[in-house]
């Protein structure tokens, strides 16, 4: 599929996605096209978008990839394929989770086989699969990415996300939390209300100003850098303009204490799931209160109260001091990042790296540029 075709296939893409089990936000046309529009030229990417069609011309599968030619400091030329939405070790773009090949239900095996076959005929030295669900490596192997092709698969990172089932009763979920988590998430509301008026409300641009400016200000104060740089801001603004194409809506919210905004939360709802993308708050507001927990508690409660929302997804990533998401009585989702290496030279270099002591391996990697 060409770049021009990618730009105009929103409806066809979404029909295929809705008939699949792929993630409805991260694998949506609004998310991936906004990512491509934002970073493709900045990073010098070439689109490698594979479409699989049935005999009637219906789109039944999508292999979303892009390619970049790298020349390492050691003058090694590497043709690297990426799954669309991530630029592993290249640039800190937004994080795209649940990356996978999209296949209409009933066509999974055919799509997997066709995509792997197409990849075999393309020119590339290694393929980077970032933040893919746990079953995707097995899917690639089943499609032919195994030892028979003499590819080497290198596991790089494993990460965990948390999904909270919000189809049930909020009070039952709350009571199942640990005592300290329940205190920080819910019970501290009473303490805050003794200090003054506490308000959780949806963001309104005409009333509340620029949401992302507020978010970035909180992050600069806490982390020393904004949550979203210039490109990331462009991406999120484009995404929000296109959310209706994937039946999504923004769920941005503010937490006010005595009419002062002390916390912001950036969520997006698509289909029956609410995704927690980012948050920012006044860290030194009160030593007895974690505003991040309090605000998240309000948002999770809102997901429970909304009839059509069955899941609140905290996504992958840890907090500043601990993996706080594990305390929220949710289900773990496992993500993998791995390389599929085809180039004999790269396989040899990675073998040297793997066989070396850690300090030597790091020095070798820096010198070669792996």
Where are these regions (language model features)?
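A conserved beta-strand-loop-helix scaffold within acyl/acetyltransferase catalytic domains
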Residues: 2-84, 88, 131-288
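Active-site/acyl-donor-binding loops of N-acyltransferases
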Residues: 67-71, 138-173, 257, 309-370
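Residues forming anionic-ligand binding surfaces in small-molecule and nucleic-acid pockets
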Residues: 86-102
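A short, internal acetyl-CoA/4′-phosphopantetheine-binding micro-motif in the GNAT/acyltransferase core
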Residues: 98-108, 279-289
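Conserved acetyl-CoA-binding loop-helix of GNAT-fold acetyltransferases
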Residues: 107-118, 287-301
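ATP-hydrolysis module of ASCE/P-loop NTPase motor domains
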Residues: 109-112, 117-136
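Conserved GNAT acetyl-CoA-binding A-motif
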Residues: 124-132, 303-316
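Hydrophobic, well-ordered secondary-structure elements that form the walls
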Residues: 259, 292, 299, 303, ...
């Amino acid at each position: 599929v060409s770049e021009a075709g990618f730009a105009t296939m929103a409806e066809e893409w979404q029909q295929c996605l809705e008939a699949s089990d792929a993630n409805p936000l991260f694998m949506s046309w609004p998310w991936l096209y906004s990512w491509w529009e934002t970073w493709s030229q900045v990073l010098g990417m070439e689109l490698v978008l594979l479409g699989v069609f049935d005999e009637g011309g219906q789109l039944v599968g999508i292999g979303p990839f892009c390619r970049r030619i790298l020349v390492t400091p050691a003058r090694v030329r590497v043709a690297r394929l990426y799954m669309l939405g991530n630029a592993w070790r290249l640039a800190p773009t937004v994080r795209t989770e649940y990356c996978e090949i999209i296949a209409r239900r009933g066509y999974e095996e055919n799509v997997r086989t066709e995509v792997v076959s197409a990849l075999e005929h393309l020119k590339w030295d290694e393929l980077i699969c970032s933040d893919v669900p746990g079953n995707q490596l097995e899917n690639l192997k089943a499609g032919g990415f195994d030892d028979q092709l003499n590819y080497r698969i290198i596991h790089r990172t494993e990460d965990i996300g948390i999904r909270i089932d919000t189809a049930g009763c909020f009070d039952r979920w709350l009571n199942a939390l640990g005592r300290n988590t329940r205190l920080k998430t819910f019970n501290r509301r009473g303490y805050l209300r003794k200090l003054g008026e506490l308000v959780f409300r949806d963001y309104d641009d005409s009333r509340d100003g620029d949401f992302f400016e507020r978010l970035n200000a909180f992050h600069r104060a806490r982390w020393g850098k904004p949550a979203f740089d210039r490109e990331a801001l462009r991406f999120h603004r484009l995404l929000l303009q296109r959310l209706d194409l994937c039946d999504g809506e923004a769920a941005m919210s503010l937490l006010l204490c005595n009419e002062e905004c002390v916390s912001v939360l950036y969520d997006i709802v698509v289909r029956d799931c609410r995704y927690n993308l980012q948050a920012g708050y006044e860290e030194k507001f009160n030593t007895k209160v974690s505003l991040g927990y309090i605000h998240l508690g309000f948002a999770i409660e809102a997901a429970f109260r909304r009839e059509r929302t069955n899941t609140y997804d905290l996504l992958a990533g840890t907090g500043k001091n601990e993996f706080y998401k594990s305390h929220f009585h949710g289900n773990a989702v496992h993500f993998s990042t791995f390389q599929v290496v085809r180039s004999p030279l790269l396989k040899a270099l990675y073998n040297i790296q793997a066989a070396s002591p850690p300090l030597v391996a790091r020095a070798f990697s820096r010198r070669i540029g792996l």
